[in-house]
Amino acid sequence: MRLVVQRVREASVAVDGQAVASIEAGLLVLVGFGAADGSDFAAGKPCRATLEKLLDLRIFPDEAGKLNLSLRETGGGLLLVSQFTLYASCRKGRRPSFSEAAPPQVALGLYNALVEMAGQALPGRVGSGVFGADMDVSLVNWGPVTILLDSADLGGAT
């Protein structure tokens, strides 16, 4: 699982011109699942560890302006948006290959499980895009602060 984490002042997702989800200050996270993740990945330690890392990253300023607070501590929102292109390979040619991404039916189950786990950890503070939809994602970056998390770096499968 790969996450592109962006600290935002606000973010929203729309599909076909209709608002689907929005948050005020918090994190907008683009989420991709790899072919090696497998359908049982969400139930395993790597997925949970990556989610915990995300929720506990100290990337919000304290009273002194030091990046010392996590999303949990600030009470901010979390907006999760599926994006299989995080597994694009540009090694050959000019057209990206997406063969390293999880198949859509597997990724959908993993994405839904991740959204559910995040919702349990942050009740009432999690929004999500529409899996597989062509979405319009709007955000106001704060900082900017952008971090890449990969479950493989945290002991995960991919």
UniProtKB/Swiss-Prot annotation:
Record's GO cellular component terms: cytoplasm
Q: Name one GO biological process term.
A: D-amino acid catabolic process
Q: Where are the transmembrane segments?
A: none
User: Which Pfam families does the entry link to?
Assistant: Tyr_Deacylase
- Where is this gene product found? Cytoplasm
As given in the record, the signal peptide range reads: none
Name the UniProt key words of this record, in alphabetical order.
Answer: Cytoplasm, Hydrolase, RNA-binding, tRNA-binding
Q: Which reaction does it catalyse?
A: glycyl-tRNA(Ala) + H2O = tRNA(Ala) + glycine + H(+); a D-aminoacyl-tRNA + H2O = a tRNA + a D-alpha-amino acid + H(+)
Q: Where is this motif: Gly-cisPro motif, important for rejection of L-amino acids?
A: 143-144
As recorded in UniProt, its EC number(s) are 3.1.1.96
- Tell me the InterPro entries matching this sequence: Daa-tRNA_deacyls_DTD, DTD-like_sf
Key word rRNA-binding present? no
Give the domain note.
A Gly-cisPro motif from one monomer fits into the active site of the other monomer to allow specific chiral rejection of L-amino acids.
Q: How does it assemble?
A: Homodimer.
Record's family?
Belongs to the DTD family.
The job of this chain, per UniProt, is described as: An aminoacyl-tRNA editing enzyme that deacylates mischarged D-aminoacyl-tRNAs. Also deacylates mischarged glycyl-tRNA(Ala), protecting cells against glycine mischarging by AlaRS. Acts via tRNA-based rather than protein-based catalysis; rejects L-amino acids rather than detecting D-amino acids in the active site. By recycling D-aminoacyl-tRNA to D-amino acids and free tRNA molecules, this enzyme counteracts the toxicity associated with the formation of D-aminoacyl-tRNA entities in vivo and helps enforce protein L-homochirality.
This chain belongs to the protein called D-aminoacyl-tRNA deacylase
Naturally occurring in which organism (per UniProt): Solidesulfovibrio magneticus (strain ATCC 700980 / DSM 13731 / RS-1)
The gene that this protein is the product of is dtd
